[in-house]
Amino acid sequence: MGLGDVYKRQGLRDKNMVKKLEHKDLLKAGVHFGHLTRKWNPKMSEYIFMENNGIHIIDLHKTIECAYTAAASLQNIAKSGRKIMFVATKKQAKTYVSEKAKELNMPYVTERWLGGMLTNFSTIRKSLKKLSALENLQNQDTYTQDFSKKERLMMSRDKDKLEKALGGISTLNRIPAALFVVDVNHEEIAVQEAKKLNIPVYGMVDTNSDPNSIDFEIPSNDDSFTSVSTIIDYVSAAIAEGLKEREKIKEEIRIKQEKEASEKEAKEKKEAEKKAKDSKKEVTK
């Protein structure tokens, strides 16, 4: 039983959870269009509604339920303060996904996945430190005076190279709590690395995918921009709600601590006044 099944069995329903996707919106976005029937993966059979003109049609009722389950789990991860890494290196998804990840302050990979990005994170972290050091150097007022034109050019090239490969995870100081991938086939290496480290994987699975390769599958068209953006918008809204809840909890804790500190101070002041008053009585006896 996968993590998704556990959440389904628990029947997670959060009053602050985003609403379920609308069937009509998914139809309009073309989320239901799968691949040619000859390219299908038999393991997707439970998510296929029918065949039409040689193309498999995805059961959108299943999409809605799976998306809700995945979104509820992602919301809880965000609420706990942990990081969710978005992975989308496909041309039609990379720009939109990177924009959404930036809005959420979540790490993302939209260029080539570097082998060992998760399983050899200690090495990746060294590269991130180098990137940070180069950025700090370039921001110094004496940068042009301290380095020759040739040195600055070399450092600029190094920085650009690192920025392109690792810019999306530049603030990541530890392995993420979860991955969200747009196409499990296209991001196979990322999925494999996550599985080795027992990191739960969420993602879009088309009719040519193996839904069992990840923990929270969302049956959907992973090739169309409108389909990808619709699913990304939905899970992003859930993550944003989780972050909002986290900030609310932190604020409630802050207010509670201030109240307790104020009450403690008032109590100590009252005790001190009582002690002073008692001492005065002793003196006057």
Model-derived regions, located:
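Short, small-residue-biased leader/transition segments that mark boundaries at the very start
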Residues: 1-7, 179
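Intrinsically disordered, compositionally biased charged tails
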Residues: 5-24, 241-285
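Ribosome large-subunit tunnel/peptidyl-transferase-proximal elements
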Residues: 14-251
